[in-house]
Amino acid sequence: MKKAKKRLQGFFYHLFIIAFGFLMLYPILWMVSSSFKDNLEIFGTASLIPKNFKFDNYINGWKGVGGVPFVVFFRNSFYYTILATIGTVFSSALVAYGFARNKFFGRKFWFVCMLLTMMLPYQVVMIPQFIIFFKLGWVNSFKPLIIPMFAGQPFFIFLMMQFIRGLPIELDESAKIDGCNRFQIFTRVIFPLITPVLITSTIFQFYWKWDDFIGPLLFLNSPKLYTVSLALRMFSDPMTSTDWGAIFAMGTLSLLPILLVFLIFQKHLVEGISTTGLKG
């Protein structure tokens, strides 16, 4: 009787998980399916299986919009995302090491200030940032999107701090005895040991920057500089008929880099989050 009850509970549990997972995946499945349909079929039926597979959507979408091929938008997104991710991860690790290992005047004060910046919505600092970067002549370039990332990001600094605090201080002392200065201790001892949290931060930042819309919208004016997220918005023109099939086709392609990064580093992502929680 108990075994039958457990089996029944297990059945309903897995049924719920499958149903919930399908609901979560349905928008993505619908987008992929719609990338093979024409406009009439996209909005005329809710079926996930196209009646006639239309591969022209990918061809038309890849031609781009506004005279700019879509490969340019992908190149811009990779350029922005990769540089911003590298700058964020390395600078955040450096700042996290400073907070976790070095004692200096006002450390707690600056740490609290850093945490407070995490609570500010981006809309609060959006206009001041634009004014500053406009006066610097950085608008309509990738500078305001990339250069600030080399100053560290509070979320990743806090995440890495928890990991570094779990490392034995004796490692630093041994390296210091061997003649290493603080920067050498960081690059040769600490940095290699925090690989799990570095990979976790890389995945998160890559995902956030690849999907970033408001930043490029605010600072990029030339279509030749547009990222994928902005380019997808350009496809929708209220003055003319919108090729929704091409939009969904390019939207499907834009998911591939994120999906590949997640699949490749999935093991490290889980490890980085779990070990950071334990060490914190």
Q: Residue spans of the language-model regions?
A:
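A structural signal for multi-pass alpha-helical bundles of membrane permease subunits
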Residues: K2-G280
